[in-house]
Every structure is written in structure tokens, then in C-alpha cells.
């Protein structure tokens, strides 16, 4: 799949190095830029409701995504936290004026009144970004999983990995160098999805996570971008831990993905 990149992503990466300094993880090199808000910030709906396991990192995820929008000036954030929020906001009426949906560590089958309508909304040219357990959401909805690009299968112990950066020009992966070292819960998926996505991060060996295939050669996707009709989709399997969400490089990874799905 050919990525459609816009030059504006480089500005956001520079802004982030200025605004989201952090002592919990490695930093990207380069100078700093004062924030230059866009003339009309986009609007994203960040969904954190869960119908299954609930990650302790969700409040940090909400805080981080909100801050990325505020400090870059690229987007404003609307939080969708409860079942009643989902039923009200994830509708054609609720999505009026929204440019992208984010599933930040959602789990289970959310009480969306008409999931098909939401998927058509994305297909019509809007954006979708999923973090970590967005792939552990809607196991009973093949159309959602097709839109996302894969389905969570299992994970082992949390472990340090060095993710291979496969695309040096995509805004979600270009700030990460050639490898991204991170300690997190590493997901494994039901299938290989290289044929239908632009792969951004991967592993060429199963992590030493205590599972039977630990340490063996493999091809494990970690982050990708894809189209869905005229819409754009970004997914990263990283983001289980609170300290990952505080990692300055992970923030650039997320911001680049959001800017790409917003077509900025």
C-alpha cells in the first residue's frame, strides 16, 4: 500500500520535541520549535470505554492524547468514557463535526448502536486510530477487524523488545530511527497482515515472553497504517503500560499516526 504523506507532519514532530519532554524514556534528536497551531484544528473522539479488561494506563492515554492536541495545535479532543457516552457519541449525529475516532485501549464489544454506520463513516473519508487493545475489541465483528487490519490472539510476559522500523518516511515511524527499544506487553495476532497494510513496526523474532515460541524467528506486526475506503487507519500494538504512554518517542509515534489519519 502506498502511503500518502503530507509535509506538515514534520512540524508536528518538532513541536512535540518542544512540548512533551519526558524523563521516562529515550528522546529523539533535533531542535525545538514553538507551537504553531493550524488555522482550524481537527476534532478527534477518544473512546476509552471497556467491556472487558480495563488497562490502568487509560487515564494516562487520555491525558497524553489531549496534551498532544493542545500543544501541537493540530486537534482538539473529545473524551468518550462510558457506555452511555458510546451510545450517544458513536452515531451519525454524534460524529457530526468529528474528523477521527481513537480507540485507546478499548476492550470487548462496545455498545455502539450501529457499528456498520461507524465503519461507513470511516470509509467515507474519516480517520481511525487504535492503540494496543483496540485489537482486543469486537472479536465478534469481522467488519471491524477487517477495518483495523488484524485481531489480537495472545500475549506473554511483559518484555523488552527492539522493534524494527520498517518505514522511515511515515510520520508515525520516522521519529523512531531504525529500531525502537521498549518494555511493554507484546501482542501476537491471528494472522500475518503484510499484504493489506503499510507495515511500520515489526519484530523478526518472537519475544522472550515465556510462550512456547519465545526466542524463535518470526514475523510479528507491531504497528501499521492502511486505507479503509477513502478513510485512513493507524494501529499500534504498543501502549499497555503507563510508562510507555509517558515515553517521548512513543508520543511522537502516536502523534504521527493521528496526524496521518487526519490527512494533515
Language model features with spans:
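A glycine-rich, often tryptophan-bearing local segment used as a flexible ligand/cofactor-contacting loop or short
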Residues: 103, 107-178
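Catalytic beta-strand/loop cores that center a nucleophilic Ser/Cys/Thr
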Residues: 97, 150, 155-229
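Bacterial N-terminal signal peptides that target proteins for export
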Residues: 1-9
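C-terminal motif of bacterial Sec signal peptides marking the signal peptidase cleavage site
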Residues: 17-19
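Bacterial lipoprotein signal-peptidase II cleavage site
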Residues: 21-28
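Short, solvent-exposed loop/turn segments at secondary-structure junctions
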Residues: 51-52, 108, 135-137, 204-207, ...
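Helical hinge/lid and interdomain linker segments adjacent to catalytic or ligand-binding clefts
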Residues: 30, 34-35, 43-47, 52-137
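Extracellular ligand-binding/catalytic regions of CAZymes and related secreted enzymes
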Residues: 28-41, 56-59, 63-72, 81-82, ...
Amino acid at each position: 500500500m502506498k502511503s500518502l504523506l503530507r509535509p506538515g507532519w514534520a512540524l508536528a514532530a518538532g513541536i512535540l520535541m518542544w512540548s512533551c519532554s519526558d524523563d521516562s524514556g529515550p528522546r529523539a534528536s533535533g531542535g525545538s520549535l514553538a507551537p504553531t497551531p493550524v488555522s482550524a484544528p481537527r476534532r478527534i473522539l477518544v473512546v476509552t470505554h471497556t467491556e472487558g479488561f480495563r488497562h490502568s494506563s487509560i487515564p494516562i492515554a487520555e491525558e497524553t492524547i489531549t496534551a498532544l492536541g493542545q500543544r501541537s495545535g493540530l486537534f482538539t479532543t473529545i473524551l468518550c468514557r462510558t457506555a452511555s457516552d458510546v451510545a450517544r457519541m458513536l452515531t451519525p449525529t454524534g460524529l457530526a463535526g468529528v474528523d477521527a475516532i481513537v480507540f485507546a485501549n478499548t476492550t470487548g464489544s462496545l455498545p455502539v448502536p450501529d457499528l456498520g454506520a461507524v465503519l461507513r463513516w470511516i470509509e467515507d473519508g474519516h480517520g481511525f486510530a487504535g492503540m494496543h487493545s483496540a485489537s482486543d475489541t469486537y472479536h465478534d465483528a469481522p467488519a471491524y477487524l477487517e477495518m483495523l487490519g488484524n485481531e489480537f490472539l495472545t500475549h506473554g510476559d511483559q518484555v523488552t523488545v527492539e522493534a524494527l522500523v520498517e518505514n522511515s518516511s511515515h510520520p508515525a515511524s520516522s521519529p523512531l530511527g531504525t529500531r525502537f527499544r521498549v518494555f511493554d506487553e507484546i501482542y501476537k495476532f491471528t494472522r500475518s497482515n503484510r499484504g493489506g497494510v503499510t507495515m511500520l513496526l515489526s519484530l523478526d523474532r518472537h519475544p522472550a515472553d515465556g510462550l512456547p515460541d519465545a526466542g524463535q524467528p518470526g514475523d510479528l506486526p507491531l504497528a501499521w497504517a492502511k486505507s479503509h475506503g477513502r478513510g485512513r487507519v493507524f494501529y499500534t500494538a504498543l501502549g499497555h503500560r503507563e510508562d510507555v504512554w509517558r515515553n517521548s518517542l512513543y508520543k511522537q509515534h502516536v502523534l504521527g499516526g493521528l496526524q496521518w489519519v487526519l490527512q494533515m
